[in-house]
């Protein structure tokens, strides 16, 4: 049952609800019998009440109506201790989670329950996690750039406002720091907020992210209301039902900020592959015939129902950045292939750039965006981006020759290309606000116009006489001159 938004939703009293009992338990799947005429709807939340006050209630979601007044439901938490005959209550609505400003700075599970030991969430506003995508008339179809203040992203692989971005990065290449910087920048530039959905991620990674966000100020421990992000986690150790629905919980919280607060929202999903994987587990448990490579036959439908809700409306936007795991590096695998159909841009983090100390380690040649078209970004932006890519591509082609024969064996034109490419490579690095406490360098937010101006000047040869180190970890091109002069003064005084 898909509901339209109702943010004044109230839970009816227990006495008025339909009651049934468990007739079968197979792992995280329960079969529940109800009286004739009292059957719950698909996606309704069922609650199995613990026998003692010490035992937690188990919430399940109706997935199938089996006939003979029975339903099949998937549990959102462990089913240890449950037994046949236990009473089950139909809540009458889908799983509903808290929404609004009180969710900022907090960590939630799939049911919207806080798990950070900071007490209950002070809000009466609840919203069901199953909702329809915004109607056509409410959509904002304009193609507009979502400026992030990160030079390499805005210039070479710009994000679309209300679009979806695939973030490809292994361990230790700066994925977490890039995520935190995007959260910080959207809060400052747009007055927006972010929601992070940890879908099937490691508990340690989720804890590390929370601690780093507190250290960098993205989460304000003293004044939680001033935090810029809400966190929703469904870890690897949780049942497949929780991992399958935690993405919808995060999205529901993001939709409130878009529809009611009229804000630009950044939604992170890590990892979208685990959303598909959990759906595959649930599908097998429900007895559905598997499709290609063992995935669920409803893969495209499940992915579409999530992705179509991530969009721009006339009130605000949800821009989504999704980490994508590619099984065995096979891009034709149904899980990543289905995801790619929804992506507007890809941001690829490079281990070789990270090894050089160039952060953010975004690969300028592998990262792509459908927004990088002259009719969308303008002629100047498009031509500058293409010239930058051509210069970096030529440098990449020459690297083998340089490694074998050295720079001296190159032609004058190629040597000039290499020098400018190395300067551009370093200019596309920049200090981050969230890394200030580690690096000691103040963070920089660089506008797109300044990035284009800087790259144009480097390519035109205006800075051929400056050392390439002057371009490393600066903001605008004006800082390059200042840094070069400072280095010159230091060398002179020595």
Swiss-Prot record:
GO terms for molecular function: ATP binding; ATP hydrolysis activity; proton-transporting ATP synthase activity, rotational mechanism. GO terms for biological process: proton motive force-driven mitochondrial ATP synthesis. Its EC number is 7.1.2.2. InterPro entries: AAA+_ATPase, ATP-synt_VA_C, ATP_synth_F1_bsu, ATPase_a/bsu_AS, ATPase_alpha/beta_chains, ATPase_F1/V1/A1_a/bsu_N, ATPase_F1/V1/A1_a/bsu_N_sf, ATPase_F1/V1/A1_a/bsu_nucl-bd. It comes from the Eukaryota. Keywords: ATP synthesis, ATP-binding, CF(1), Hydrogen ion transport, Ion transport, Membrane, Nucleotide-binding, Plastid, Translocase, Transport. Produces ATP from ADP in the presence of a proton gradient across the membrane. The catalytic sites are hosted primarily by the beta subunits. Belongs to the ATPase alpha/beta chains family. PANTHER family: ATP SYNTHASE, ATP SYNTHASE SUBUNIT BETA, MITOCHONDRIAL. This is ATP synthase subunit beta, plastid. It comes from Cuscuta obtusiflora (Peruvian dodder). The gene is atpB.
